[in-house]
A protein has these predicted regions:
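Short, hydrophobic/aromatic-rich segments at coil-to-beta transitions
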Residues: 31-40, 62-68, 89-100, 143-149, ...
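Post-signal peptide N-terminal segment of secreted/secretory-pathway proteins
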Residues: 66-127, 167, 179-218
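Bacterial Sec-dependent N-terminal signal peptides
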Residues: 2-6, 10, 14-42, 122, ...
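Surface-exposed or flexible loop/turn and strand-edge residues in extracellular/cell-surface modules
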Residues: 34, 39, 52, 64, ...
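Short, surface-exposed loop motifs enriched in S/T, G, D/E and P with embedded aromatic residues
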Residues: 81-88, 123, 190-200, 217, ...
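N-terminal glycine/threonine-rich, aromatic-flanked beta-hairpin/loop signature
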Residues: 51-82, 152-193, 257-368, 374-379
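Mixed-charge, low-complexity intrinsically disordered segments
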Residues: 253-294, 298, 318-349, 368-437, ...
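Short, solvent-exposed coil/turn segments at beta-strand boundaries
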Residues: 58-66, 89-90, 120-131, 169-177, ...
Length: 510
């Protein structure tokens, strides 16, 4: 009996030993394909979507392997992940693994330092070489790059903003930044720091010297969508709606001579102090009259929005200005009355201007107005504006001599007589903004205006002929007017205005 028990015990141990050896000697993993897997055998997905690329597989034991793939993730041409394997009842193997990548993606426009990218893979592989592979990639590395044109969808205050450039960068997953180029009013470049990348997108907020910026966004199909909500710093309370000044008439004392029916106030503010008392009083009154009759026909109000936009209620109807009114001013007949103006103002048809065509920002105690020239041209010309984009860019970024030549070619006129100083002034206004003064009165009126010296380049007669009758004809104002008249850009019925305009440069040096 004891002998039988001994045999039974030996048999059990032998079976157990055989079973253990059988498990240890399972070499089925060695039958798995090695190296590159044929494309027709790969079911490949990236973040849940089918994709293409090259897959390499190499099992190193029954429980482990390496999975490599090329040209799958933008900027990461070659990724290898160590995975754990588990054999299935049907002989196939399941595998999964995760790899943290601390290398920036290599793209055409960015190829440096180290953002964080997390890559996770899982799938199955059969001895016949059939592979199903799912890759998940998350982190700042997916966003790094330069976005513009068709790769950027940018909104500013819920309105599309085109023609801009955004650079997404990072040194690691906790230090992500976005560079905005000429997007925030008054700032050539703005860096958004502390960008939080999570849940398939990014978000954050940044304070600059001029504004507070909140933003959200995401990237899909190589296109970056960025939404900006901007609030301008406004310590002087300039952000509000302004209506036009009242048109009032009265008697002015022009160097001892009363001038009845003169415009005292209007929608155009003009205050010009020169030695000649006649011109010091007469010319501002003329400008107030012309502006006071024309502006109310096209403009109802202007709003400086909290986000830096400038919007307006305007009319696109025709403008009426009778030549006889100008003659009346010249020969002392007085200005048209309030009743005449009221009949000129449209009673309906007022429109709200589009957003992102003009901006304001405070700087050095001045209110700067900056035009978005590409957007204005696009709004005016629609799809035809695209063909002008290179020319507009060359003008905005060119020097005075180049710009003069380009504009002359476009308008088919000779601009060579106009000074470089005038074009430098205009380019500075377009590229950097127009520096305006703001003055509030105790009666609640606001005057927004330019200093007289701002017009020096275009008003000063640089030739100063010895013949006093020709004073002013050497100014760029007179030359520009004559060029545009000769080219019929200015209509003939406005020709008489030069009689008024010439008085400005004639008296400017004083």
């Amino acid at each position: 009996m004891k002998k039988n028990l001994l045999y039974l015990f030996a048999l059990i141990c032998s079976v157990s030993l055989f079973t253990a050896c059988s498990d240890d000697d399972d070499n089925s993993w060695q039958e798995l394909p090695k190296g590159e897997i044929k494309a027709e055998n790969v079911d490949f997905q990236l973040n849940g979507a089918s994709t293409t690329g090259t897959v390499n597989f190499e099992a190193t034991s029954l429980q482990s392997a390496t999975v490599g793939f090329k040209n799958v993730i933008d900027g990461y041409s070659d990724v290898t992940v160590d995975v754990a394997m588990e054999k299935q009842a049907d002989g196939s193997f399941k595998f999964n693994g995760t790899k943290d990548i601390m290398t920036k993606p290599v793209t055409r426009e960015t190829a440096k330092p180290t953002p964080l990218l997390k890559v996770t893979v899982d799938g199955t592989i059969t001895p016949e070489g059939k592979v199903a592979l799912n890759v998940s990639a998350t982190g700042a590395g997916l966003y790094i790059g330069t976005y513009k044109g068709e790769t950027l969808v940018l909104t500013y205050g819920e309105t599309a903003l085109t023609g801009k450039e955004v650079v997404f960068d990072a040194t690691d997953g906790d230090n992500v930044s976005i560079l905005l180029k000429d997007v925030i009013p008054g700032e050539t470049e703005t860096t958004l720091t502390g960008v939080q990348v999570a849940n398939g997108g990014f978000s954050g907020s940044t304070k600059t010297n001029s504004s507070t910026i909140e933003y959200t966004g995401y990237r899909k199909d190589k296109v970056l969508t960025l939404n900006l909500k901007v609030t301008m710093n406004d310590p002087k309370g300039w952000a509000k709606t302004y209506t036009l000044g009242e048109y009032t008439l009265g008697t002015l004392d022009v160097d001892g001579t009363p001038m009845p029916n003169s415009v005292l106030t209007s929608s155009l503010y003009s205050n010009w102090e020169v030695e000649d008392a006649y011109y010091s009083t007469f010319f501002p009154a003329v400008l107030r009259t012309i502006g006071g009759l024309i502006l109310p026909q096209v403009l109802q109000s202007v709003t400086l929005e909290a986000d830096g936009n400038i919007s307006a209620k305007y009319s696109s109807g025709s403008i009426t200005f009778e030549p006889s009114w100008a003659m009346g001013l010249i020969f002392g007949g007085g200005a048209p009355g309030v009743d005449v103006l009221n009949k000129l103002i449209p009673t309906d048809g007022w429109q709200q201007s589009p957003k992102n065509l003009a901006y304001w920002f405070p700087k050095d105690d001045k209110l700067y107005l900056k035009l978005n020239v590409p957007a204005i041209i696009s709004q005016a010309m629609g799809s035809n504006a695209e063909s002008l984009a290179p020319i507009i860019s060359e003008i905005l970024n060119g020097d005075a001599a180049t710009v003069k030549k380009l504009i002359g070619t476009m308008l088919k006129v000779d601009m060579s007589s106009i000074s470089d100083e005038t074009f430098e002034m205009l380019l500075s206004w377009v590229n950097n903004g127009v520096p305006l003064n703001v003055k509030n009165t105790d009666k609640g009126h606001t005057y927004i205006y330019l200093d007289k010296t701002a017009f020096d380049p275009i008003m000063v007669d640089k030739e100063m002929s010895a013949d006093s009758s020709e004073f002013g004809t050497g100014s760029d104002l007179f030359k520009l007017w004559k060029i545009m008249m000769d080219a019929k850009i200015i209509p003939e019925d406005a020709a008489a205005a030069i009689i008024l305009l010439i008085g400005l440069p004639q008296n400017w040096p004083s």
